[in-house]
Amino acid sequence: MSNEREMQNKKDQQLESFRVEDEGKKLTTNQGLKVSEDEFSLKAGERGPTLMEDFHFREKMTHFDHERIPERIVHARGFAAHGEFQVYDSMKEFTKAKFLQDPSVKTPVFVRFSTVAGSKGSAETVRDARGFATKFYTEEGNYDLVGNNIPVFFIQDAIKFPDLVHALKPEPHNEIPQAQSAHDTFWDFIANNQESAHMVMWAMSDRSIPRSFRMMEGFGVHTFRFVNEEGKAHFVKFHWKPVLGIHSLVWDEAQKIAGKDPDFHRRDLWESIENGDYPEYELGVQLISEEDEFNFDFDVLDPTKIWPEEEVPVKIIGKMTLNRNVDNVFAETEQVAFHPGHVVPGIDFTNDPLLQGRLFSYTDTQLIRLGGPNFHELPINRPVCPFHNNQRDGYGRQTINKGQVSYHKNSLAANTPQPASEEEGGYAHYQEKVEGRKVRKRSESFKDHFSQAKLFWNSMSEVEKNHIIEAFSFELGKVQSKSVQQQVVEMFAHVTSDLAKPVAEAIGANLPQSEGSSVTKSSLALSQENTIKKPDTRKVGVIIDNGFNGDEVKQVLNELQSKGIQAEFISDKLGIKKCAGGSEIEIDHTFLTGESVLFDALYVVGGKEVDPSFKDDAVYFIKEAYAHFKPIGATHVGIKWLEEQEIVEKEGVVTGTDMNIFSQNLTGAVMEHRHWNR
């Protein structure tokens, strides 16, 4: 679908000039010379030595030897898509950013989702924060909102970032473990850098094992500024709210998917867009006037703190739709360069010390990863508006600048290109008053590390709290150092003993004495139990064999599909299965290739005469789906299999002989996502 579309926006039109279709063409060298042979190198005789004059071999091999570029130090494993953003109403009251003014304007975007810790080839369903980086191609230049799916971070000052990443990455003496935080150095860092407490609570929650990129929130993490035409500023935090709601995997399921389909999240995103089920996210902002900066019990500049939505409501201002897959992952997803310093008039920075460090680091890392200062000229990074300056030369330069002048000020070119006034669209930094002594120290207002960690805990449902306890128990159970284990338990005892004590018992640590923070506040916005629940794009595995009731299956599938639910057929063999009346269904997966963990729900149909091995495989699927709290529907022989497992009357298990009622009940069960009360 994505390769057979009309040009959708200015960015798509720009990229079209760089796209190349090789199918049906003659093979050439990079110099355009047609090649007559591509299977054998040039040799002196059939069994003789290869000749150095074989320019085609040398070009082909040299290019191959240099195909790889350094992967990102963090966020190496990522996948991306194109789309568009549209503001709902003008935000003129708060910002002069043009792309936030006109509801009729669609701004092209490019969004890259990623894990943080793992290498480029690591699994996607690991426990980890997820990157959520958006590049807006606006008429005023590129604006990058470089965020995560968690609204806070581990550290407050960017100078600690190398230490955090060194601790999180595989341990250097043996390069183990990959894409995991369950090891000694990470938890040693956490215990000795207790500002991380709030972020760790999020990381140990279900937020760090999302069901899909389409079902996770995004956050700008930092505090930025909106500045309007009059020069008035507001502190702002950015939120992406998924239209499908916020949903997660369970931990056992996530680990199994990592082995069964390490590309699970990118496959889900790719297939959704190819099927026309375009992911949608609403953009929300929290706004605090500068006059109210000190009216809260948190510092608005602290990146380890949220602004609770009950205190600072999220104003929904627009929607982003991802509607086109990339044409080439390397050229687009791998070579895209995000940078929080890519801003437009009306959006400015604050003194968040983590943000300030990122403003240096992102440009610096692109220089080595993309080979020099001209990464902005790569097709995916080019703005859709013209750019003119006196930057010249360097590796990979593509622009051919005409004229003799490449400096400012000048008279030979009438002092052009010349700076634009603020009225002409020139970027003017917000005139913040700054004063103080040069010091290396933490603000007193940054020193409360546990209150919001307790707020997060208070906001969780009992199920979510149990998942956090289990996650801590798993992670610390992998830690070899008893000292580190004990330090972490004592650290989180300052949050709540309701967490620290069961974790201590699980790993054999001494029970902590602290009862934890006295904070009693909670926030409904933090629990996934309060999220939107929709059946759209859920995937149901239909276990089926020859002799099934064709009319009943058709009726059920029609109901599921009318609600946007997708069905895929699973059996013992690929090929065709026939119903009792003769109609046919083509099988999508065998029991070997389609695991229950790859589906949101099961619909167990069976068949007229099922052999024992088919039943054994079907029952395995049923048991695993049930253990992962997934909806299960069954008819006919499927009901018997559920009865044998004594789960027919359990929540989220749907049976029946009236197909109208059965179909509606199964749809409702699928919409709930998980059924925890069983």
From Swiss-Prot:
Keyword Transferase carried by entry: no
Chaperone listed as a keyword: no
Residue numbers annotated as active site: 75, 148
Highest taxon listed in the record's lineage: Bacteria
Molecular-function GO terms, alphabetical: catalase activity; heme binding; metal ion binding
Catalysis performed (reactions): 2 H2O2 = O2 + 2 H2O
Entry's localization field: Cytoplasm
Stored InterPro entries: Catalase, Catalase_AS, Catalase_clade2, Catalase_clade2_helical, Catalase_core, Catalase_haem_BS, Catalase_immune_responsive, Catalase_large_C
Residues the record lists as binding heme: 362
SUPFAM superfamilies documented for this protein: Class I glutamine amidotransferase-like, Heme-dependent catalase-like
Keywords: Cytoplasm, Heme, Hydrogen peroxide, Iron, Metal-binding, Oxidoreductase, Peroxidase
Known cofactor(s): heme
Residue numbers spanned by region Disordered: 1-32
GO CC terms of this entry: cytosol
Gene Ontology biological process terms, A to Z: hydrogen peroxide catabolic process; response to oxidative stress
Biased composition (Basic and acidic residues): 1-26
Function: Decomposes hydrogen peroxide into water and oxygen; serves to protect cells from the toxic effects of hydrogen peroxide.
Family classification: Belongs to the catalase family. HPII subfamily.
Protein name: Catalase
Organism name: Alkalihalophilus pseudofirmus (strain ATCC BAA-2126 / JCM 17055 / OF4)
Species classification: Bacteria, Bacillati, Bacillota, Bacilli, Bacillales
